[in-house]
């Protein structure tokens, strides 16, 4: 998982005149469709012809534009536009009869382009950050896939565009006043265009985000011309903070379906479309804080890889912080008791509730989870790897801001991986520890919607122990049967067992072997098989048994085997060969970052040239150690197509000055 890059850590030298030549082009060739319902909404899109290069398979990228006031039908004041970016890929096989899957990354504030480009999308970006190769395990093999950047201001989605200055040393970002001259850029001072970075013009919590996404879906599924299925089933797959997104969004959609069907929804004509929900898949999701917090001390100290990431004393301190009077557990219970009375819909409308819930999250994170980060030296998303880890490779970060990619997508701003303003808006209302997520999952199951929980067993961030506890914490009609189901091996092919699964009917919990936070990146075939089996009503264990109808005796299909899977042990993996990609400083050591700042680093295509990178990517960085040429102000250039080119585009990645459009 790529973290938000600290700007000072990303300090690079920029030649201002070169950077200005690389600004994203004004979008051209964009199709504009005004809503037929007169709501003021519209769709803009292009056929980019990128990433999915399989002959005959179409893709479309664009925006659903929602005007101010769209959310008023939910009693929410919204005085800003919501321009939500999407990228849709037809299924490679029989798209007319294929179901549709929606993919969203978490954060909150993370772009779904991360999942698309490194996990389950049609292509991967090569080490040159300028070309792609097809992914044979893409989730659009048999499913139409829709990737969405949400909530507004995430990734390529925006409210309004504005010009900013950015000081790379102090990390200060200042909005330029209208008519103010564009300042001259230098090595540590840049200008550019972003979404507004106004915390008041993004979603304040998961429930608020669900409302905006539902309106997006109403427009897209009724009016987007590139989607004409005979199969109207819609599934949602999400990851990480998607442990909240998935339950809340899907439950909200189903609640709206019920209101439309029974006539209690009084929205305008364009908001009467029933979304035929089929499956919710959560990949390494942080679902319920109260249930999952005990899993962090266990994962750090007693996991199936026999890795003691913290010592006994630190482990005891983590447990004490969790269970002592006034500790993490008590703070969350206090948050939930207040929110259930004063803010039952988790809209952030009560400042006392917000503060109490925010305080609970801060305490629990610092004292229960973060000792692992402070003392282990291991990766947050893969306990088997030491920090820094270069996996999944961040080559896509530069590719998404290549001028030809921006032009093909028709986007009016630069892409960013994570938005700290969005994350802050969620944290400000204490969205993390609030209640309701497991209840949402129970509601979905009671309404016939499948729930598939998938967890890589090397992740710490939202680890599988917590995922298992969440699965057992869902209280619904078949809870007893699910608890009594044993674990069965996940048969991927004739020679490979990909993990263990407990399943009864529409609910499954899968532990995937040898996988970190982003399961499809680590185990692409296993992830694809689980995805297909979930959507096509097959058992997760073998893919051969029907799960949609009752068997003899009136029971649904259920797995049998051991009551838990802890007894299935793993060996720690070898370490990845390390390389530093300067657009993602989480892949770099402190010394490497300093070498970029002080001008001693040699860099090609955003990769620091050393013995590791020359062995991994000789066609990109060269096969031997180069002789760097100093550049004024710091970094070094290898050639006109080496570091200098990288610096020019990084200016575009961080910021850009463009004509404000759409």
UniProtKB/Swiss-Prot annotation:
The keyword Cell membrane applies. GO terms for biological process: proteolysis. GO terms for molecular function: serine-type carboxypeptidase activity. It comes from the Eukaryota. It is an enzyme of class 3 (hydrolase). Residues 634-662 form a propeptide. Induction: Expression is strongly increased during growth on protein-rich medium. Residues 1-21 form the signal peptide. It catalyses: Preferential release of a C-terminal arginine or lysine residue. Keywords: Carboxypeptidase, Cell membrane, Disulfide bond, Glycoprotein, GPI-anchor, Hydrolase, Lipoprotein, Membrane, Protease, Signal, Virulence. The active site is at residues 240, 459, 517. Disulfide bonds join 51-123, 328-364, 335-357. PROSITE patterns: CARBOXYPEPT_SER_SER. Substrate binds at residues 462, 518. InterPro entries: AB_hydrolase_fold, Peptidase_S10, Ser_caboxypep_ser_AS. It is a lipid-anchor; GPI-anchor. GO terms for cellular component: fungal-type vacuole; plasma membrane; side of membrane. The keyword Membrane applies. SUPFAM superfamilies: alpha/beta-Hydrolases. Glycans are attached at residues 130, 163, 186, 200, 262, 302, 311, 350, 414, 475, 493, 506, 598, 612. Its EC number is 3.4.16.6. Its main location: membrane. A lipid is attached at residue 633 (GPI-anchor amidated glycine). Extracellular serine carboxypeptidase that contributes to pathogenicity. Belongs to the peptidase S10 family. This is Carboxypeptidase S1 homolog B. It comes from Trichophyton rubrum (Athlete's foot fungus). The gene is SCPB.
């Amino acid at each position: 998982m790529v973290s938000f890059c600290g700007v000072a850590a990303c300090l690079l030298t920029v030649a201002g005149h070169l950077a200005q030549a690389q600004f994203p082009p004004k979008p051209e060739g964009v199709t504009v469709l005004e809503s037929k319902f007169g709501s003021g909404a519209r769709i803009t899109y292009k056929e980019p012809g990128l990433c999915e290069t399989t002959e005959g398979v179409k893709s479309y990228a664009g925006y659903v534009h929602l005007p101010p006031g769209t959310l008023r039908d939910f009693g929410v004041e919204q005085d800003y536009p919501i321009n939500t970016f999407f990228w849709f890929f037809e299924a490679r096989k029989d798209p007319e009869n294929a179901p549709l899957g929606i993919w969203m990354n978490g954060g909150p504030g993370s772009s779904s382009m991360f999942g698309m480009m490194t996990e389950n999308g049609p292509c991967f970006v090569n080490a040159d950050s300028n070309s792609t190769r097809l992914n044979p395990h893409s989730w659009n093999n048999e499913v139409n896939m829709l990737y969405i950047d949400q909530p507004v201001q995430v990734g390529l989605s925006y409210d309004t565009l504005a010009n900013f200055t950015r000081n790379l040393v102090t990390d200060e970002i200042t909005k330029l006043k209208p008519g103010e001259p564009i300042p001259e850029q230098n090595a540590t001072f840049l200008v550019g265009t972003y979404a507004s970075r106004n915390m008041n013009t993004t979603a304040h919590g998961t429930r608020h985000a669900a409302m905006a996404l539902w309106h997006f879906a109403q427009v897209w599924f009724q009016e987007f011309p590139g989607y004409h299925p005979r199969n109207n089933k819609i599934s949602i797959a999400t990851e990480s903070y998607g442990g909240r997104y998935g339950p809340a969004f899907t439950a909200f959609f189903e609640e709206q379906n019920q209101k439309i069907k029974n006539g209690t929804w009084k929205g305008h004509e364009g908001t009467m479309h029933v979304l035929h929900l089929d499956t919710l898949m959560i990949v390494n999701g942080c679902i319920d804080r109260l249930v999952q917090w005990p899993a962090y001390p266990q994962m750090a100290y007693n996991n199936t890889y026999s890795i003691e990431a913290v010592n006994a004393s630190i482990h005891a301190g983590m447990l004490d912080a969790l269970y002592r009077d006034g500790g993490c557990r008590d703070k969350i219970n206090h948050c939930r008791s207040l929110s259930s009375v004063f803010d039952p819909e988790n809209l952030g409308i009560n400042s006392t509730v917000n503060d109490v819930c925010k305080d609970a999250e801060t305490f629990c994170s610092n004292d229960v989870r973060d000792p692992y980060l402070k003392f282990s030296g291991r990766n947050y998303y893969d306990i088997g790897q030491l920090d820094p880890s270069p996996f999944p490779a961040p080559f896509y970060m530069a590719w998404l801001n290549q001028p030809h990619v921006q032009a093909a997508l028709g986007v009016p701003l630069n892409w960013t991986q994570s938005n700290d303003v969005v994350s802050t808006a969620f944290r400000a209302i204490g969205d993390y520890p609030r209640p309701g997520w497991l209840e949402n999952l129970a509601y979905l199951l009671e309404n016939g919607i499948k729930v598939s929980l998938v967890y890589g067993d090397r992740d710490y961030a939202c680890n599988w122990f917590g995922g298992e506890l969440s699965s057992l914490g869902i209280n619904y009609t078949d809870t007893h049967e699910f608890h009594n189901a044993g674990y069965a091996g996940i048969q991927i092919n004739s020679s490979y067992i990909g993990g263990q699964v407990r399943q009864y009917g529409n609910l499954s919990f899968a532990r995937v072997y040898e996988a970190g936070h982003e399961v499809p990146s680590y185990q692409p075939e296993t992830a694809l098989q689980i995805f297909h089996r979930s959507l096509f009503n097959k058992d997760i264990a073998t893919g051969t048994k029907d799960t949609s109808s009752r068997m003899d005796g009136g029971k649904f299909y259920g797995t049998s085997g051991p009551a838990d899977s802890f007894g299935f042990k793993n060996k720690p993996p070898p370490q990845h060969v390390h390389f530093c990609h300067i657009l993602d400083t989480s892949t770099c050591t402190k010394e490497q970052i300093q070498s970029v700042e002080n001008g001693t680093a040699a860099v090609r295509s955003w990769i620091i040239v050393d013995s590791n990178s020359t062995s991994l990517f000789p066609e990109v960085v060269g096969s031997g150690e180069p002789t760097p040429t100093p550049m004024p102000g710091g970094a070094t250039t290898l050639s006109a197509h080496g570091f200098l080119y990288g610096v020019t585009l990084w200016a575009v990645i961080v910021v850009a000055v463009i004509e404000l459009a759409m």
